[in-house]
Amino acid sequence: MASIDAFSDLERRMDGFQKDVAQVLARQQNHARQQLQQFQAEMRQLHNQHQHLIDELQRLATQRTALQQQIHAAQQATNTTREQWRSYHERESELSRRQSTLAAQSRELDSLLQQRGKECVQLRARWAAQSGNDAAEVALYERLLQLRVLPGASDVHDVRFVFGDDSRCWIEVAMHGDHVIGNSHPALDPKSRATLEHVLTVQGDLAAFLVVARDMLLASL
């Protein structure tokens, strides 16, 4: 009878763990979607700015052509004063400078659009790869290390790894951008934290990180 109760308790714990993992992964996926939407909105805005600059360049080119025709006519007209002719040249020079400035801005925006497009492709690839691997890895670590995965206390993108049943042995990691080691209980000394960050960020080995972190935390209790 005791073994049946223990199995039921384990089943409830597994259900709770799966719900916790689903919530954490859902938040991470929602953040990735928001980043992608933001990139797309920025790209639309940049496209609009780029098109506006192209239209402005065309308008300035038309004005410059008309002004050059006026200059030529002024040079031929016997009643055109030297001051008026100089004024036309000054205006033509100003339009030429503005046209050059807008052309440079257009090239910069075009380069930025290409960069943002590449970033969107990379973001989609990371999101697809991460969403496919997280659930299986977390389930394996839970069985091997008595691990639970909970949301972090300070940031929606942080994850708290809890070892054991009493919630006194845990460590938090920022899961977006560079993986940064956060708070832990018990607190770890700087040397231990540096070791964990090396395993996670340099070696990129999440499994090794969880094993080493668990051993360090249990040894410090």
Curated annotation (Swiss-Prot):
Biological processes, Gene Ontology terms: cell division; centromere clustering; chromosome segregation
Comp. bias intervals (Basic and acidic residues): 83-97
Stretches the record annotates as Disordered: 76-101
Coiled coil: 9-112
Residues the record lists as N-acetylalanine modifications: 2
Annotated localization: Nucleus; Chromosome, Centromere, Kinetochore
Anything else known: Present with 3280 molecules/cell in log phase SD medium.
Similarity field: Belongs to the SPC25 family.
Protein name: Kinetochore protein SPC25
Name of the gene: SPC25
